[in-house]
């Protein structure tokens, strides 16, 4: 159980763990590349360790010590048929991107995960991969895990995705790299583009045209050194802590500021928050900066439309900030929250309400009333890492002690979260 006390101030200079999305892809692409890939700044959280485990079961040598990883790549067809099921744990990224890779392989594989993964929709990925020629089955005609995949010769497709999802786009692109001809994906809005950037870093040609990204089949990846920046989704919790605790300021070093992920920065600024980007630079095709965050009086805003895919994971902690903003904050167009580790609309509302916050669910988001005094509460993370951390930030401003049950879920993306919170809280 995580115990959080009310904080007087947040101060210091810190780094957050490596970016989860980039860490997954570095291991996957390193395994498929020819030659050695070294990774520094890897996130040694449960989800990324699941990705390592899956590739080890297919004969790839991977050495991991803390945030340093070495992958001995064997090329696209160097993977071996696993003798056991591939267990992705709690990782939606692992199962969806791996589905695209497995669709290209000349063998059979079964992928499964934990209870949360068993409830998450897979047909959005399976449908286009079937169109390309992969034989894939699962519960309810491939809607749910376990997934049985027999890969083979694939044909490139031009796919119009009904959702802006980096996982869907990435699975199709990865399958497309070994399909005949050109494969393209067009999205309704831009989603995260870590796959495109990292494929280019590994020597793959990727063509972008507006909302469409395309790759030609038959391309090879070349092993290389990768430096993973800090995860902006993890930094978001510390940014929020500074915004809600008066008199606070924090320098967060080496954070990835990929434009497809910086919705949180835009929202903080729109609410009146002070956040400066220092020492901006490019590392492995990814933009990186140090963030200087200073406490500010916030005001409520409306968050909707194209920005939602750029901050979907940050909505739980944005809701916490909104409780301390003057006026009302409205979040719309965020139906995707319902199919995360939990139904995050329902979970944010139920847990934040325990503090005495004024928060109302809607079909596609929530309405948060500010400015509200919070009282310490007993919170259940429901096994969702982002809910656990968001409620811990609420605990920093709540009167009395806050207890968070099922806090082990936090290790999925932010090992050492509680220790860091104690270090910067005064």
Swiss-Prot record:
Compartment(s) of residence: Cytoplasm
Database matches in CDD domains: EPSP_synthase (cd01556)
Any one GO molecular function term: 3-phosphoshikimate 1-carboxyvinyltransferase activity
GO cellular component: cytoplasm
Pathway linked to the protein: Metabolic intermediate biosynthesis; chorismate biosynthesis; chorismate from D-erythrose 4-phosphate and phosphoenolpyruvate: step 6/7
GO BP, sorted A to Z: amino acid biosynthetic process; aromatic amino acid family biosynthetic process; chorismate biosynthetic process
InterPro entries per UniProt: Enolpyruvate_Tfrase_dom, Enolpyruvate_Tfrase_sf, EPSP_synthase, EPSP_synthase_CS, RNA3'P_cycl/enolpyr_Trfase_a/b
Catalytic residues of the enzyme: 313 (proton acceptor)
UniProt key word ATP-binding: no
Catalytic activity: 3-phosphoshikimate + phosphoenolpyruvate = 5-O-(1-carboxyvinyl)-3-phosphoshikimate + phosphate
Quaternary assembly: Monomer.
Family statement drawn from the similarity comment of this UniProt entry: Belongs to the EPSP synthase family.
Protein name from the UniProt record: 3-phosphoshikimate 1-carboxyvinyltransferase
Organism: Brevibacillus brevis (strain 47 / JCM 6285 / NBRC 100599)
Lineage: Bacteria, Bacillati, Bacillota, Bacilli, Bacillales
Gene that specifies this protein: aroA
